[in-house]
């Protein structure tokens, strides 16, 4: 049975004064032995309040994309790039939906990938993936992937263009020969 804990920089603001053994403050987190750590894409592991702890446990960090992939292997088309991700993902979603596919548009586009419901064996996903989501991903791969373009962006997060490009290309790192 898994033990799941939640942390937020401002527990009181998010959860009030409710006492809950699953909510942990910043002093408690480093004392817990974790098998896996799922980090929200918006969290900069190198700059957040838990950066020292997260750097030490980097091999245990997974993303929302990794959790998704563990349930829905080979059920997605993933689009990334600096510009045009949303437009391309929307057009692709419309084309597939017009062909009567049960297709969901998820990811960085504003529809959280882990919030989809009523998923069947015929459900297919068009995923817009940001460099933030791909940066710490360890498991995620997509049946079909596209990197549209790359130009300097989010350097404040990735620190340099090489790291930004590396985050984008993580999408292709674990693709099989059968993937496109």
How would you name each of these model-derived features?
Residues 7-10, 39-43:
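Structural motif
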Residues 29-35, 41, 45-179:
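Phosphate-binding loop of NTP-binding sites
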Residues 9-10, 18-21, 58:
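Short linear motifs in intrinsically disordered/low-complexity regions
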Residues 3, 20-22, 60, 102:
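Conserved beta-strand segments of alpha/beta enzyme cores
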Residues 5, 25-29, 38:
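Glycine/alanine-rich phosphate-binding loops at beta-alpha junctions
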Residues 2-16:
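NAD(P)-binding Rossmann-fold cofactor-contacting core
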Residues 12, 25-27, 63:
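A diffuse structural propensity rather than consistent per-protein peaks
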Residues 16-32:
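Glycine-rich, highly charged phosphate/nucleotide-binding loops
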């Amino acid at each position: 049975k898994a033990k799941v804990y939640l942390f937020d920089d401002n527990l009181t603001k998010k959860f009030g004064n409710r006492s809950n053994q699953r909510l942990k403050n910043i002093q408690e987190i480093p004392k817990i032995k974790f098998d896996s750590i799922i980090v929200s894409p918006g969290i900069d592991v190198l700059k957040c309040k838990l950066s020292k702890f997260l750097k030490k446990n980097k091999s245990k960090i997974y993303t929302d994309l990794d959790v998704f992939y563990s349930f829905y292997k080979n059920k997605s088309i993933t689009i990334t790039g600096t510009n045009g991700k949303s437009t391309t993902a929307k057009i692709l979603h419309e084309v597939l939906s017009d062909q009567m596919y049960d297709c969901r548009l998820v990811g960085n586009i504003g529809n959280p990938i882990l919030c989809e419901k009523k998923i069947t064996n015929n459900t297919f996903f068009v995923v817009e993936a940001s460099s933030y989501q791909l940066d710490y991903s360890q498991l995620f791969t997509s049946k079909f992937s596209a990197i549209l373009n790359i130009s300097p962006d989010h350097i404040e997060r990735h620190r340099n263009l090489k790291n930004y490009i590396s985050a984008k290309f993580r999408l292709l790192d674990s693709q099989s020969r059968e993937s496109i």
